[in-house]
């Protein structure tokens, strides 16, 4: 399933996303940020640069939202049911003093180590990027106008 999804990510996700997508390199985004900050520093004008801390975002993905994203992107009901089954079957057990506790069912988030999880996360994050872009287009955020970086 992860391999089938990976083969289509480059068509589903905007070019701004580079992690976990074949043919794209996450280092490109680091270089873009480095060049952008250098450019801003050289301009010597007050500017803001937004960085989002997504440290816990993987664990807080809303399942209903993810399923709506998949539906919006054209994933059929069978695919969505499979993903829903993967999500609903995830649980955690805590080992304390050698005893394994009861299972704790997850209600949100993506299972780390599950092959499709990074790709599903990218699909959700792409919606966030689209929202930031729309806010910029509507004048709520000011885009950075630069020459070639």
Tell what function each PLM region has.
Residues 1-149:
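Nucleotidyl polymerases of mobile genetic elements and RNA viruses
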């Amino acid at each position: 399933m992860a391999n089938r999804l990976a083969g289509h990510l480059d068509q589903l996700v905007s070019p701004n996303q580079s992690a976990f997508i074949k043919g794209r390199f996450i280092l490109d985004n680091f270089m873009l940020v480095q060049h952008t900050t250098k450019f801003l520093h050289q301009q010597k004008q007050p500017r803001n640069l937004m960085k989002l801390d997504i440290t816990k975002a993987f664990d807080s993905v809303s399942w209903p939202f993810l399923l709506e994203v998949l539906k919006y992107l054209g994933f059929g009901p069978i695919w969505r049911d499979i993903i829903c089954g993967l999500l609903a079957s995830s649980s955690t057990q805590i080992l304390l003093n050698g005893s394994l506790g009861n299972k704790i069912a997850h209600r949100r988030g993506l299972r780390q180590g599950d092959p499709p999880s990074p790709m599903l996360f990218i699909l959700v994050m792409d919606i966030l990027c689209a929202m930031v872009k729309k806010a910029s287009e509507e004048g709520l955020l000011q885009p950075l106008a630069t020459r070639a970086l």
